[in-house]
């Protein structure tokens, strides 16, 4: 079992989640494929970097992310920064021969994502984009049922991701509301998770027809005191423009003939982290709700007439990733476990000299879908989704 030294760039919300995963992964999956060593963490502010190192268990801290790239003892570069920094860091890490895990979205645009993909595709390195919700055991179980043909040929997919943290017009103008940093709003921030799951479960998108809406066109300028999402109340004072979407709705045509839709917003009062999908096929249906993430609802046409309807499967040791989680079904998993599973699969690929999905290729394809959604909304028409070449 080898030790792999990790350099984490970004000490915020996602830095916390990734650090937890590195510490806990060997406790859940033992023997671990490799042992993540929390070597150094980078934050632009030296004091914040030092504090993050103490809090998240890193041996060292730095205010210069380039020192992580230049360090020959670092094996893994973890990018947990705002979106505008992803491409520069990832390309530098690839040129240095580091394995890379990058938070989603891969980048702000398809063009940036292509540059990242081009930087890694011919290198002998493992690269991953952190669409962690597909690591939820119930989602992986849905994939298993689909691959086994349990619901027949897929006809339709309906996915949503609804949050409410930006519904307050007085929440400040954090970077997530600025196109120059984020690239997009709800589209890149949360819809990408559902788009990734749609590709994972159903297949490639061939065309989209979308609407993008910005409900709150300006917000108070941020003056400190906000949390990782920028949510504080009482925004008196000057305001700045919001130039990203608050809500996205898109219809989908899949390459295999199925149809679908994705809706995402961060302005839905009462919806904290509401991720759902329904998949209907010729022989059955699958329903998932992340707020009940230990459960998968299934219905099969083959059931006798007096037993037809949805049944609930509680995930546990008999299901995907069950060997590393909890010994009794429905004991409950959280967001952290999806990150732990993600870390396990990433380090397993490194240890075995393999690859892992979702890779930068997947992140690039999602970015092309996002670009097509933006184009469709501007044109108010269907737009074909380009496919990356292998």
From Swiss-Prot:
Description of pH dependence: Stable in a pH range between 5.0 and 8.5 at 40 degrees Celsius for 30 min.
Thermal behavior of activity: Optimum temperature is 60 degrees Celsius.
Task of the protein: Catalyzes the oxidation of levoglucosan (1,6-anhydro-beta-D-glucose, LG) to 3-dehydrolevoglucosan (3-keto-LG). Exhibits high substrate specificity toward levoglucosan and NAD(+) for the oxidative reaction. Exhibits weak activities (about 4% compared with that of LG) toward L-sorbose and 1,5-anhydro-D-glucitol, and activity toward D-xylose is also detectable (1.7%). Can also efficiently catalyzes the NADH-dependent reduction (reverse reaction) of 3-keto-LG.
Oligomer and partners: Homotetramer.
UniProt protein name: Levoglucosan dehydrogenase
Species of origin: Pseudarthrobacter phenanthrenivorans (strain DSM 18606 / JCM 16027 / LMG 23796 / Sphe3)
Family, per entry: Belongs to the Gfo/Idh/MocA family.
InterPro entries: Gfo/Idh/MocA-like_OxRdtase_N, Gfo/Idh/MocA_oxidrdct_glycsds, GFO_IDH_MocA-like_dom, NAD(P)-bd_dom_sf
Residues holding NADH: 13-14, 43, 81, 83, 86, 103-104, 130, 132, 175-176, 335
Lineage start: Bacteria, Bacillati, Actinomycetota, Actinomycetes, Micrococcales
Reactions performed catalytically: levoglucosan + NAD(+) = 3-dehydrolevoglucosan + NADH + H(+)
């Amino acid at each position: 079992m080898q030790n792999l030294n990790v350099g984490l760039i970004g000490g915020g919300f996602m830095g916390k989640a990734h650090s937890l995963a590195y510490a806990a992964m060997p406790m859940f999956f033992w023997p671990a494929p490799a042992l993540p060593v929390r070597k150094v963490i980078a934050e632009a502010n030296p004091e914040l970097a030092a504090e993050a190192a103490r809090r998240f268990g890193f041996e060292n801290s730095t205010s210069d992310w380039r020192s992580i790239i230049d360090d020959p003892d670092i094996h893994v570069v973890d990018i947990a920064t705002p979106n505008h920094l992803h491409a520069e860091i990832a390309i530098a890490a690839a040129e240095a021969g580091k394995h890379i895990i990058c938070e989603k979205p891969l980048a702000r645009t398809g063009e940036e994502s292509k540059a990242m993909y081009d930087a890694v595709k011919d290198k002998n390195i493992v690269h991953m984009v952190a669409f962690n919700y597909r690591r939820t055991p119930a989602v992986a179980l849905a994939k298993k049922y689909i691959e086994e043909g349990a619901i027949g040929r897929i006809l339709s997919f309906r996915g949503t991701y609804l949050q409410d943290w930006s519904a307050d017009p007085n929440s400040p103008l954090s970077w997530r509301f600025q196109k120059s940093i984020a690239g997009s709003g709800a589209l890149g921030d949360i819809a990408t998770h559902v788009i990734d799951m749609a590709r994972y479960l159903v297949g490639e998108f061939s065309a989209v027809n979308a609407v993008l809406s910005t409900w709150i066109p300006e917000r108070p300028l941020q003056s400190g005191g906000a949390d990782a999402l920028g949510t504080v109340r009482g925004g008196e004072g000057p305001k700045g423009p919001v130039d990203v979407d608050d809500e996205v709705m898109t219809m989908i045509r899949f390459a295999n003939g199925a149809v679908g839709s994705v809706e995402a917003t961060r302005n839905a009062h009462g919806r904290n982290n509401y991720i759902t999908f329904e998949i209907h096929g010729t022989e059955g249906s699958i329903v998932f709700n992340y707020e009940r993430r230990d459960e998968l609802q299934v219905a099969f046409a083959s059931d006798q007439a007096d037993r037809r309807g949805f049944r609930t499967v509680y995930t546990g040791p008999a299901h995907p990733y069950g060997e590393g989680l909890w010994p009794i079904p429905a004991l409950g998993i959280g967001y952290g476990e999806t990150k732990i599973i993600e870390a396990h699969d990433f380090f397993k690929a490194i240890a075995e000299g393999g690859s892992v999905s979702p890779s930068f290729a997947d992140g690039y394809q999602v970015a092309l879908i996002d670009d097509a959604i933006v184009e469709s909304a501007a044109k108010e028409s269907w737009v074909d989704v380009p496919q990356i070449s292998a």
